[in-house]
């Protein structure tokens, strides 16, 4: 069956969408509303080739020629030349641009030129590593012996890999847990290590990126111990400042290759907004048809049309739901196609994943609902269409996912289906924010003390730390952490360096937030189903929570926090659960500020107390709220970074916001700001939290806070401070553009609000944000010498606006004294060594609302990244 052209496919989908709206599900509007808000035609481009480098061995060139590569693209040769010359390089080009050849060419050439040389390849997902291993095996170059070393590798094969493989494909987890602690057994491999390849390096962001940066510094240190200094070759999606991001990740100078020479077919890219339904939501809000239900219908229509389609969803559960729904629909309209639809996600057995990948490659499958495990690099050729069930969090991921279709210069269709949240609403009504702005820079902090502490302990257990090592890990920032570890008795100073003091190996969870993971156990059989990160357990495996494991649904009966065990029973409910939290926040210190008259914008350190207090049950499909159940779980403490602004009561009154309206206005503005921060920072709304209050005791004014949901901060709040005008203007526009009357999940309601989304004042939130934006704009327009701003270094950022000239304050809030409290440190998490803080007390303020950051990512990794690895990660 030949698929119709992209424009024809889109016309069919639009007709179906109008028919659905005509059923009357969108009251008070055109009965035949068009769900497509914008169509962008991304043009095709010609490819540009280069001759093979003179140093490339004939067998390597012939092997690539055998796979249809007569001449490489220019960016492939540019990157390969730099790597071959001994310079670390990042190649940041578009999806399907052939980045793999850019590192395969120098690596394989080196392995053939020196029969003792070795290479290490790091992948964020198992699917991508398996795809690369398949390619390397098919090249069949003599003596290379590529091998996988991950959680799927049988124990009896690992010894062979260590002793004989010259090109090991693994992931950061296995380097951290398997290779570095056992470096003596890997000595032969490491002393001959020529190249380290880091594929899809843009996925290493936030706290997870900081962990990977520490693992790579530990790897460099161990390699140096054996006399090796490998060249790093990084492959990245098109991102802003790839050179800077790569250097922060690996800690060495890196050259960037960004001139993409590959051909590209045209893409018809549609922005799709499901219709608003009846007012069945919280507080009588209208409920928009879910992106999952809409995606299932679109995938059904495309499969019936003969279009090979990949639908990207945000969770493992959603992948199963979409695939099941599509098969059920096909049973009615085209039963012969029902078995040509499947789900693909992490958590499947290795054999199941490999079988699905083969079925995708040979065309046996027409439709696949996948998590982002298939986003990264897997060679799925010949696809006609891609559906994105919600904005994936970053433009880099959006272009990665949409680029899965139309590979090899084929024309393709891509459809972004908006979820019921402020960011998606903003994007489908502001297409320039999708198609007219550069891709984000990757945000990570390699000297986050909460990350450095555990890794410095791991490094000291591998080899005693020296002063040179402290410089490697971050200089003065690392030295402060080392001193704290010595004070805690975890490290001991000796003339030769710092030593790990315990006989047991230190632990560091590079994908979690610290603490022991919670084991999920089937109550009737005692079978271990999986684990959940400690930081996510209160929100994901609380009593009554729905837990999904490999397509099977369970309900949590009991959560034992002392034993870190959640007992579950098999059940098939027609509802989902959503935890709700409340927050208390204390300002510890302010590091950067912008004084804008009645408005003051600040960045600082805060202490947050979070508590899961209840959960909602929502009927599926549909999303209607069934009930809310209270929970009795302990509060958790977090020291992190927040961006916040205050507004004087006089300015609020002048803007038409009475004192009684302030809580609802601030609460609504906070919710929307959380939803829109991913527009300027590489984060997910579940990575951040917020609080708004009509009078905060630490500021003495109405205040809106947005904070990083990770100990020590992850760089997201800092990015919000730097791009405050861009961020808050988008927030204001998203609220204003929403078609509801008084607020809904598409604009100001939050799925994790512990105050029941009450009070919320949509109209007054727009007035509040207008006031803040006018004040910040006046500072920018009237700035002469930076007299209005303090904090941060004077570095040029294209969209930082007023934050460009700030200088560090290094101080605390005027008149605020901090009591010294208990000090704690942890090798697996907790506060950084030497961190003294007072006990958190309730503020007693009129808190308008709060939204607690959570870790709702499948696999416990960073937002949007499926766990790749060593095993032992969450499976739900």
State each model region's role.
Residues 769-782:
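Short Fe-S-cluster ligation motifs
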């Amino acid at each position: 069956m030949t698929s119709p052209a992209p424009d024809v496919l889109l016309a069919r989908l639009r007709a179906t969408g109008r028919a659905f709206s005509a059923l009357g599900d969108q009251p008070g509007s055109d009965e035949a509303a068009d769900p497509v808000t914008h169509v962008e035609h991304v043009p095709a481009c010609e490819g540009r080739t280069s001759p093979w480098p003179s140093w490339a061995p004939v067998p390597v060139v012939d092997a690539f020629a055998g796979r249809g590569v007569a001449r490489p693209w220019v960016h492939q040769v540019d990157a390969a030349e730099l790597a071959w010359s001994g310079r670390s390089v990042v190649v940041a080009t578009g999806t399907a641009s052939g980045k793999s050849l850019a590192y395969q060419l120098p690596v394989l050439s080196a392995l053939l030129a020196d029969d003792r040389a070795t290479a290490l390849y790091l992948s964020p997902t198992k699917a991508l590593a398996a795809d690369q291993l398949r390619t390397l095996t098919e090249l069949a170059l003599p003596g290379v012996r590529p091998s996988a070393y991950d959680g799927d590798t049988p124990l009896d094969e690992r010894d062979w890999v260590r002793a004989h493989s010259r090109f090991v494909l693994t992931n950061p987890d296995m380097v951290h847990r398997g290779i570095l602690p056992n470096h003596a057994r890997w000595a032969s491999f490491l002393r001959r290590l020529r190249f380290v390849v880091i594929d899809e390096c843009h996925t290493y962001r936030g706290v997870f990126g900081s962990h990977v940066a520490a693992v790579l510094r530990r790897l460099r240190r161990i390699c140096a111990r054996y006399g090796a200094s490998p060249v790093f070759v990084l492959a990245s999606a098109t991102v802003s400042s790839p050179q800077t991001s790569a250097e922060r990740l690996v800690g060495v100078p890196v050259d960037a290759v960004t001139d993409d020479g590959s051909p590209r077919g045209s893409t018809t890219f549609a922005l799709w907004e499901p219709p608003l339904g009846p007012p069945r939501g919280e507080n009588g809000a209208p409920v928009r048809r879910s992106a999952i239900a809409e995606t299932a219908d679109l995938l059904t229509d495309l499969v019936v049309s003969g279009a090979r389609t990949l639908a990207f969803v945000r969770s493992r559960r959603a992948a199963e739901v979409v695939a099941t729904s599509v098969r059920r629909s096909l049973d009615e309209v085209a039963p012969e196609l029902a078995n040509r639809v499947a789900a693909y996600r992490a958590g499947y057995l290795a054999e199941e994943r490999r079988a699905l990948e083969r079925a995708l490659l040979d065309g046996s499958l027409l439709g696949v609902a996948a998590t982002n495990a298939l986003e990264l690099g897997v060679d799925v050729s010949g696809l006609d269409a891609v559906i994105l069930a919600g904005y994936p969090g970053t433009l880099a991921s959006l272009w990665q996912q949409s680029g899965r279709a139309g590979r090899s210069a084929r024309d393709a269709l891509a459809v972004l289906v908006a979820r019921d949240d402020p960011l998606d609403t903003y994007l489908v009504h502001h297409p320039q924010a999708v198609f007219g702005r550069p891709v984000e820079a990757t945000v990570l902090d390699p000297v986050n003390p909460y990350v450095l502490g555990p890794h410095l302990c791991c490094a000291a257990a591998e080899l005693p730390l020296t002063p040179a090592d402290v410089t490697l890990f971050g200089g003065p920032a690392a030295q402060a952490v080392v001193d704290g570890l010595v004070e805690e008795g975890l490290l001991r100073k000796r003339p030769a360096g710092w030593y790990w003091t315990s006989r047991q190996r230190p632990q560091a969870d590079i994908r979690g937030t610290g603490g022991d993971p919670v084991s999920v156990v089937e109550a009737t059989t005692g079978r271990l189903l999986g684990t959940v990160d400690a930081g996510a357990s209160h929100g994901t495996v609380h009593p009554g929570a729905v837990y999904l494991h490999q397509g099977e649904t369970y309900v949590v009966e009991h959560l034992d926090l002392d034993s870190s065990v959640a007992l579950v029973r098999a059940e098939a409910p027609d509802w989902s659960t959503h935890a709700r939290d409340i927050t208390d926040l204390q300002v510890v210190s302010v590091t950067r500020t912008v004084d804008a008259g009645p408005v003051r914008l600040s960045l600082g350190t805060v202490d947050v107390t979070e508590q899961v207090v209840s959960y909602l049950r929502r009927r599926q499909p549909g999303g209607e709220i069934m009930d809310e159940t209270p929970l009795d779980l302990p509060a958790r403490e977090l020291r992190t970074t927040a961006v916040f602004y205050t507004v004087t009561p006089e300015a609020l009154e002048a803007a038409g916001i009475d004192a009684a309206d302030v809580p609802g206005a601030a609460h609504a503005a906070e919710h929307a700001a959380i939803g829109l921060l991913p527009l300027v920072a590489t984060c997910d709304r579940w990575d951040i939290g917020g609080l708004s209050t009509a009078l905060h005791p630490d500021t003495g004014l109405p205040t809106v806070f947005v904070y990083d949901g990770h100990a020590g901060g992850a760089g997201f709040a800092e990015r919000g401070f730097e791009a405050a005008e861009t961020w808050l203007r988008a927030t204001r526009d998203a609220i204003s553009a929403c078609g509801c009357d008084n607020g809904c999940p598409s604009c100001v309601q939050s799925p994790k609000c512990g105050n029941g989304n009450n009070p919320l004042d949509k109209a007054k939130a727009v007035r509040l944000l207008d006031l803040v934006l006018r004040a910040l704009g006046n500072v920018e327009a009237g700035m002469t010498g930076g007299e209005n701003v303090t904090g941060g270094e004077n570095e040029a950022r294209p969209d930082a606006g007023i934050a460009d000239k700030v200088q560090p304050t290094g101080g605390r809030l005027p008149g605020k004294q901090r009591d010294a409290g208990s000090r704690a440190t942890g090798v697996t998490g907790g506060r950084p060594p030497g961190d003294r803080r007072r006990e958190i007390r309730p503020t007693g303020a009129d808190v308008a609302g709060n939204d607690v950051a959570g870790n709702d990512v499948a696999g416990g990794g960073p937002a949007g990244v499926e766990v790749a690895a060593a095993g032992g990660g969450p499976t739900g």
